[in-house]
Amino acid sequence: MLGQFQPHLAKSILGKGDSEMPGVLDIKWSPDMLNGSPAFGLVNSVGMAELYVLNNSAEVKVTKLLGVNLGENVLGLSLDWSNRINKSTTPQLTTSSSDGCVQIHQLTQGELTPVCSWKAHDYEAWITAFDNWNTNVVYSGGDDCRLKGWDLRQNSTSPVFSSKRHEMGVCSIQSCPIREYLLCTGSYDEHLLVWDGRQMKQPLADLRVGGGVWRVKWHPRHARLILTATMYNGYHVVDAQHSTDGKMAVIHHYDEDVSLGYGADWCYSDSYDNLIATCSFYNHALQLWQFTMISHDVG
């Protein structure tokens, strides 16, 4: 169902925060305040990784804090923060780019300092993500159909694992913020996989959702729920409670006003449980919707 909101207020806030910039391919809020202000990172179509803060004032104002170039003639494709579990005022960021590279950056004293960069994939490195529970480990997925894991304490030229379980490009990865070792991945092959990070030879569970799985998001409070942005097949809420037994099921499918589902996330507020924001590409649409879990959905 569509939620009931105050559209005039939402429009006003968004309008004050508008900023002209190149195409943004990924954007994520910082789990912690930066200099006492909410902040987010993004990567864009001119190969920049940038950090922005929201000014603490009566009006929402977005200010660019800093930026770093990911390389010549590349697109920035994804980013992730290291401080979702272990809070830090000096977190690391991992980014990926269209030349197949993955980068690590350290945020200290208002500077985003490059730590390392390596060629992770033969083609576009669509996605990179930290292991939320062990941020020495970084995952990456590429258009070469490979899902890889990297230990930052070792030589980053050699992955600790390289999986060909997905049959097409790997474009989404997220480490579960609620249960250690759980990892979900999505691919153009239309499959959502859940893994145990300690044993990456085979996934725990495999579910075909009928569209390229461009983004995956674990629920911030319920480890059983995964949200997918499924490109030409809308958005799905998946029950993964029994994924360790090889079972997953779609419990909600949203496909209203969707041209190409590219973005999706849960609301983190306890006041709006199961409130979801999604966005589609060609029609420039932002959707806000909720679903209601009933007992047989998650039995």
Place the predicted regions along the sequence by residue.
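Beta-propeller domains
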Residues: 1-18, 54-63
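Structured C-terminal portions of repeat-based eukaryotic scaffold domains
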Residues: 157-299
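Loop/turn segments within WD40 beta-propeller blades
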Residues: 28-37, 80-90, 128-135, 174-181, ...
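Conserved strand-to-loop turn within each blade of WD40 beta-propeller repeats
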Residues: 43-46, 96-99, 140-144, 152, ...
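Solenoidal tandem-repeat scaffolds enriched in leucines and small polar residues
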Residues: 79-168
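WD40 beta-propeller blade core
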Residues: 50, 103, 116, 148-150, ...
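Asp-box/WD-like beta-propeller blade repeats and closely related beta-sheet repeat scaffolds
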Residues: 21-24, 47-88, 113-117
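WD40/WD-repeat beta-propeller blade N-cap
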Residues: 8-25, 67-77, 118-125, 163-170, ...
